[in-house]
A protein has these predicted regions:
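Short active-site-adjacent structural elements
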Residues: 175-176, 232-233, 237-240, 257
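Juxtamembrane/interface motifs at transmembrane-helix termini
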Residues: 215, 244-246
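A conserved acidic, glycine/proline-rich C-terminal tail/linker
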Residues: 209-237
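Catalytic-core "active-site belt" of small-molecule-metabolizing enzymes
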Residues: 2-204, 245, 253-261
Length: 261
């Protein structure tokens, strides 16, 4: 376990890395005893510093929701990070590629809450009842920590690699479609790069949301009405570069397009 002074130093280092767009050396290489709970402590302090600087928390992202990704990272549960107001973009936008370090894109669904959600004991039925609508979303992954050799402990401290999100397509009520069967085709520059179905997110994307409610309850937190929850990716991360146009076709749920400038 890390002491409070070290946790504060890491949070400050990550704030500076985001400001300068310069990744820091891997935390687990420098602090081999660092734990997942240490990482969440860093993330919570980092979030508080951002809120003190004027950013507004509008939701959470859930990561590492697929069994393949969990096996690859040697963990048995997802992770989560904060979404701030200035991270939420709309389809058709131009994204400043230079704003991010190692940007990648994933295909997801976002849940927008009409009621508060609080654990422990939150179930998938609580999530569906508390959801106003579900809408297609792309997540733009960022990294303030060097990529090579990075572990879940590094990623959690780095706000679960959250960079931004792009929302678009057609909002639907959570009971209007079978969310497990929502699918998407991800294009880069008119070439199909990835395809996926939302059942790849813990068998149902709402399962990630109730996991989140129960997990953050252990950290003394909860979700409020109006929060946006990125439920987890059902494609592999797609590397993007300056000049790339990304398009995600969700079929009946519409599409999302953005260009990296």
């Amino acid at each position: 376990m890390l002491d409070a002074k070290t946790i504060e130093a890491i949070a400050d280092e990550l704030l500076e890395a985001a400001r300068t767009r310069t990744p820091v050396p891997r935390l687990t290489a420098r602090y081999p005893g660092m734990t997942v709970e240490d990482s969440y402590a860093v993330q919570q302090l980092w979030r508080r510093r951002n809120e003190e600087a004027g950013r507004t928390l509008v939701g959470r992202k859930i990561g590492l929701t697929s069994k393949a990704m969990q096996a690859a990272t040697g963990i048995t549960e997802p992770d989560y990070g904060a979404i701030f107001d200035d991270m939420v973009l709309e389809t058709g936008c131009s994204v400043a590629w230079d704003k991010y370090t190692h940007p990648r894109v994933e295909v997801e669904l976002a849940f927008v809450l009409k009621d508060a959600l609080k654990g422990p004991g939150c179930t998938i039925f609580d999530v569906l009842n508390a959801t106003d609508y579900v809408v297609p979303a792309l997540e733009i992954l960022d990294s303030r920590i060097e990529m090579e050799g990075r572990t879940i402990v590094d990623t959690i401290a780095d706000n679960a690699a959250m960079g931004a999100m792009v929302v678009g397509g057609n909002p639907v009520r959570p009971d209007a479609v079978d969310l497990r069967w929502v699918s998407a085709i991800l294009y880069k520059n008119q070439t199909v790069e990835e395809t996926g179905v939302a059942a790849g997110v813990l068998d149902h994307p709402a399962n990630g949301v109730h996991w989140l409610a129960n997990k953050i309850a252990a950290h003394g937190d909860s979700m409020k009405a109006g929060d946006i929850i990125l439920a987890g990716s059902f494609t592999r991360p797609l590397w993007v570069y300056k000049g790339d146009t990304v398009h995600a076709d969700y079929g009946p749920l519409g599409s999302i397009t953005c260009r990296f400038e």
